[in-house]
Amino acid sequence: MKKAGRPVGNKAASGGGKGDSVTAGNCAGKNTVKSPTSAPLSKVKSNDDLLAAMAGSSAGTNNSVAKGKKSTSTHSTSCGTNTNNPDTKTKTTSGPSGKRTTSMTSKESNSSRERLRNSRNSSSKKQSSTGASDRAQPKHSRALAQTSDSESRMSKSKSDGQLSDKVALEAKVKNLLGLAKSKDVEILQLRGELRDMRVQLGLPEEDEEEERPPEREAAAVITAADVESTLLLLQEQNQAIRGELNLLKNENRMLKDRLNALGFSLEQRLDGADKTFGFPSTSPELSSGGAGAHGDCATVASSVEGSAPGSMEDLLTGGQRSGSTDNLDSESSEVYQAVTSSDDALDAPSGCGSSSSSESEGGPPACRSSSRKGSSGNTSEVSVACLTERIHQMEENQHSTSEELQATLQELADLQQITQELNGENERLGEEKVLLMDSLCQQSDKLEHCGRQIEYFRSLLDEHGVAYSVDEDIKSGRYMELEQRYVELAENARFEREQLLGVQQHLSNTLKMAEQDNAEAQNVIAALKERNHHMERLLDVERQERASMAAVLEECKAAVNNDQAELSRCRVLLEQERQKVAELYSIHNAGDKSDIHQLLEGVRLDKEEAEAKASKLQDDLGHARSEVACLQDTLNKLDAEYRDFQSVVQKELAEQKRAIEKQREDLQEKETEIGDMKETIFELEDEVEQHRAVKLHDNLIISDLENSMKKLQDQKHDMEREIKILHRRLREESAEWRQFQADLQTAVVIANDIKSEAQEEIGDLRRRLQEAQEKNEKLGKEIEEVKNRKQDEERGRVYNYMNAVERDLAALRQGMGLSRRPSTSSEPSPTVKTLIKSFDSASQGPGANATAVAAAAAAAAAAAAVTVTSTTPTAPLPRTPLSPSPMKTPPAAAVSPIQRHSITGSMAAAKPLSSLADKRPSYTDISMPAEHLLRAANSRPASALQRVSNMDTSKTITVSRRSSEEPKRDISTPDGGPASSLISMSSAAALSSSSSPTASVNPTARSRLREERKDPLSALAREYGGSKRNALLRWCQKKTEGYQNIDITNFSSSWNDGLAFCAVLHTYLPAHIPYQELNSQDKRRNFTLAFQAAESVGIKSTLDITDMVHTERPDWQSVMTYVTSIYKYFET
């Protein structure tokens, strides 16, 4: 990207004065009008921000300048945070606060401009009026003073306006420079994303290095005259940015075309995303306006929906999905998200840029303002929401990928340990196989010796005419009687146990109810006692109050008595004084008047004092009487209340006593019932113990009877086997060699067919391998980092399969090559030699001896039709994840048609998605009996060769039958021909070697059963393919299909609301979980219902409800362990 970085000169340094400042102000006004010409700077969805910043930066006050600086600082801070996180594609917008700030500053700037314009007009009017008044009336000095004041104010306002315009222009230039830097950061982010997409797609990086943008020289002082040159500089930078964006758009379209060529259906995904979010189509050809935000939403929808048909996963697996290809599909969908989002984000501003350029060239200001208002709001909000959703989706993908990687590492460690165990088991099985072959030879010799003894004993019995038939009816009747008796005893014991359990449960329930009633009665008694104590306390309080009132009453009575005594004394004194007055009157009448006057005065004073005392005492007496009356009324009231309260308390006490007596009686009855129940429980427990002892004794008797019955059955089977062997040897001694010869011919022909089929499969595999390699090479050039590990795994599996097939063919060649040794048999067969030679020649060159092979095949088919009359055709198995073609007849059919039938049954009984590696041990089990047969043919006489070869063949047949889990003991018809003889021989050999622990089950089936018993997810991984974690995840997705609000993509965040657990358990236990009533908000209820439903069937909860409720991403291993336990309980 090229940018023009011109140094900004200080043009206004030489000039000064009012003229320059006025000119600068006019220029600033012009530049303010021309400010929409800088609209091409909005190439990356920032046209609204630029215009808002330009409008907001022209404020005329210091507050508006401060606000503009604050918005600029927040904008630069957001840009810095965006440069620190280049992976997240967030746009550098100043946010809603910045928009509100710019809108406020724009309003303030408009209002300041209007005030400035009005002040200038008013000042000019005042100046003209004052000039006229000076010329007309030079007398008025006051008018002159006003004119000078107005001139000074006008000059001051002009200077203030010029300064405010200068500061506003400087802030505007700073905002424009900050926006240009933010656009540089956005373009660098787009470049980094393009580079990441190239790395993810495996494209070679371009050798040519783009020119680094030169740093701008910071201007020390930016004056108002520099705004026009700065705008021109920004226009040139916008042109450079436009060219760079066009270049990036072309590169993105080229990448999109390549992705379309690779099979990514971009239009279908975009249409699906538009339908999902309700947006118009955002194809590259029709992208305009706010298509960037729509593109982001579309990519989010596509990432949620997953990979569509025809994606990279379909190209790699050909319709079979596995865990490894799931990783590839998720990564390719992430690549597609990056491409589409960047392309749509670049397509969208092109339309905006063209419209803004057309508006700057000739559009009216109304159109510019309408476009500015229409484009702001939707793009920022929608883009922020879509980017937030996309970041959340990327975090989910990252967590899922890390979870899958951890699970894969754990499974790899488990597989390494299993491989070591299987290697040790394979060595042990090889040793056991050698021991079995030796024991087979010994058993065949022993069987031959026993046959001779039985023949001798039978000849003796025939000579003496002794009947040696076994009384089977009596034994069978006795056995049936014992079995019927055992069934009856078991039924009776079970019935009695259920009855005793029912009685015990009933008694325990009754005991619990009695205990509850007792507890309630005790509570009632305690409550009544507490109430009684409370009443007693109230009674004591009332008694104390009554005593205090009585004491107060006594005191009042004493005071009244004292007052009455004092009143009587006063009356006596009054009478005495009256007498004295009468005497004094008499003395006055008789004697000196002066003395009498003095005495009268003294007496009058005494009288007044006595009257005052009398009135005072009278008042005190009245008060005392009123108090006594009040106290008497109060005392009467208290007496009445006390009597009422006492009666109520006595009634309540009587009721409480009656209730307590009743409760005591009930308690005694309950205690007696509890004692009776305990005695009954003890008796029942004694009876249960007796029944258990009787049952144990009966079980011992039954086990003894079963052991004796098994012994009798073994003896019976031994006798039957010996009789069958004697019958076959007496009647079919001459036909055994012909039968063996026909079987050997059939075996050779079938081995040849198997070899040709194996070669065809190898050819098909090599052809498919070559095609896959070509396809992988073609795709590997474009997505190397994604494909390398998966391709190595596929190659390793294919190579392992080829090596296994080659090893199996080598074992077959080794087993069949031994037959070319010179035979020392007394009866050589030229037909067998001819077949062996034809087989060897067919192994060296399949096309050279086609006639001999066809003749051998026809002869073998005829022999098979003669010997075996009813055989089931081998059905081809379904395709496995590693096999390119349907599996044909397994090589285990190379021994005889009967063994072919048994192996066909075992393969049909096996699981349909089992791999070929699980069936490899059966190849070696085939080659050993033939080798042993040919070795025995070189060392033994003809009769021993016939017997031992038949026994070895029957031994292999028996092992294969037991591996197919369909044991057939008694398949024998005395007069059934050669086929029946072979079947009887096989059962006899199987029973004779039943002492060996490994002869009853095929090692492959045994190892598989042990593996499934240890790890229940092994069968699931074989069924779905891929790792165990992905297989269990797909099983959960399959079980929860059709459930709403369920999207299982991992084992952590997909299970944090409990609905996934409820959905999985609802498929098995619908009565325990009301799924329609659940929601994702009530997490605790969801987890509680799910865990209770699982515990009701015996699945122990290993998760804590509190941790699950409060954790956004629970431990995926714990969740996977719990889900595994659910799968193990319901599916295994």
UniProtKB/Swiss-Prot annotation:
Residues 226-268, 385-440, 478-798 form a coiled coil. Gene3D superfamilies: Calponin-like domain (1.10.418.10). The keyword Endoplasmic reticulum does not apply. Residues 1-166, 301-381, 869-895, 939-1016 are annotated as: Disordered. Residues 333-343, 946-961 have a biased composition (Polar residues). It holds the Pfam family CH. Belongs to the cytospin-A family. This is Cytospin-A. It comes from Danio rerio. The gene is specc1la.
